[in-house]
Swiss-Prot record:
Name of the protein described by the UniProt record: Large ribosomal subunit protein uL5
Species this protein is from: Chlorobium chlorochromatii (strain CaD3)
Stored InterPro entries: Ribosomal_uL5 (IPR002132), Ribosomal_uL5_bac-type (IPR020930), Ribosomal_uL5_C (IPR031309), Ribosomal_uL5_dom_sf (IPR022803), Ribosomal_uL5_N (IPR031310)
A Pfam family: Ribosomal_L5_C
Family named by the database record: Belongs to the universal ribosomal protein uL5 family.
Assembly and interaction partners: Part of the 50S ribosomal subunit; part of the 5S rRNA/L5/L18/L25 subcomplex. Contacts the 5S rRNA and the P site tRNA. Forms a bridge to the 30S subunit in the 70S ribosome.
PANTHER family reported in the protein's UniProt record: 60S RIBOSOMAL PROTEIN L11-RELATED (PTHR11994)
GO molecular function: rRNA binding; structural constituent of ribosome; tRNA binding
Keyword set includes Nucleus: no
Keywords of this entry: Ribonucleoprotein, Ribosomal protein, RNA-binding, rRNA-binding, tRNA-binding
Highest taxon in the source lineage: Bacteria
Function description: This is one of the proteins that bind and probably mediate the attachment of the 5S RNA into the large ribosomal subunit, where it forms part of the central protuberance. In the 70S ribosome it contacts protein S13 of the 30S subunit (bridge B1b), connecting the 2 subunits; this bridge is implicated in subunit movement. Contacts the P site tRNA; the 5S rRNA and some of its associated proteins might help stabilize positioning of ribosome-bound tRNAs.
GO CC annotation terms, alphabetical: ribonucleoprotein complex; ribosome
GO BP terms: translation
Length: 195
């Protein structure tokens, strides 16, 4: 009897997309790529969100705003990123704060992915699908977002300036094709390929 309660509490602790991945995506990928073992099936490992604030040198408050917005979007506090070397043309000193990033894993990762695909992406102006050319050759995908206001967590009236971000989806896929199929099965709205 207690085993049934444990499995029920485990299932309720999973994100909706994680359950969908296990029940629908894994069998579809096993059939498509003829995997012999379920452990060969690629999975989403982490999502890294990065906001660069180039004007943080002149206006330090912009970095605080970016940290606050990224905290609202991701649900966890981001790391402050500092410059590695000085570049005089950009008026940049070594060790100066220039951005922030956050890495999401497990439940938080699946919940963010679900919100990104179902709530944020449809709010992009003139959206015709995400580019399928942003794969890195190792099965990872990076999407550039030009406006942080596509996320429903951000209050448009309180945004001092529009800023963008990079969102990297790191998978265990061995090739870009496997990663493309994995992300497509999870609901990533790529542009339609012209075959």
């Amino acid at each position: 009897m207690s085993g049934n309660n444990e499995s029920a509490s485990y299932a309720s602790s999973l994100a909706r997309l994680d359950t969908y991945y296990r029940e629908k995506v894994v069998p579809a990928l096993m059939e498509r790529f003829q995997y012999k073992n379920i452990m060969e099936v690629p999975r989403l490992q982490k999502i890294a969100i990065n906001i660069g604030v180039g004007d943080a040198a002149g206006e330090p408050k912009l970095l605080d705003v970016a940290v606050g917005e990224l905290t609202q979007i991701a649900g966890q506090k981001p790391q402050i990123r500092k410059s590695k070397k000085a570049i005089s043309n950009f008026k940049l000193r070594e060790g100066q704060a220039i951005g922030c990033r956050v890495t999401l894993r497990r439940k938080a990762m699946y919940e963010f992915f679900d919100r990104f695909v179902s709530l944020a992406v449809p709010r992009i102006r003139d959206f015709r699908g995400l580019s399928d050319t942003s794969f890195d050759g190792r099965g990872n995908y990076t999407a550039g977002v030009k406006e942080q206001i596509i996320f429903p967590e951000i209050d448009i009236d309180k945004v001092p300036r529009i800023s963008g971000m990079d969102i990297s989806f790191v998978t265990s896929a061995k090739s870009d094709e496997e990663a493309y199929v994995l992300l497509s099965e999870l609901g990533m709205p790529f542009k339609k390929k012209n075959n």
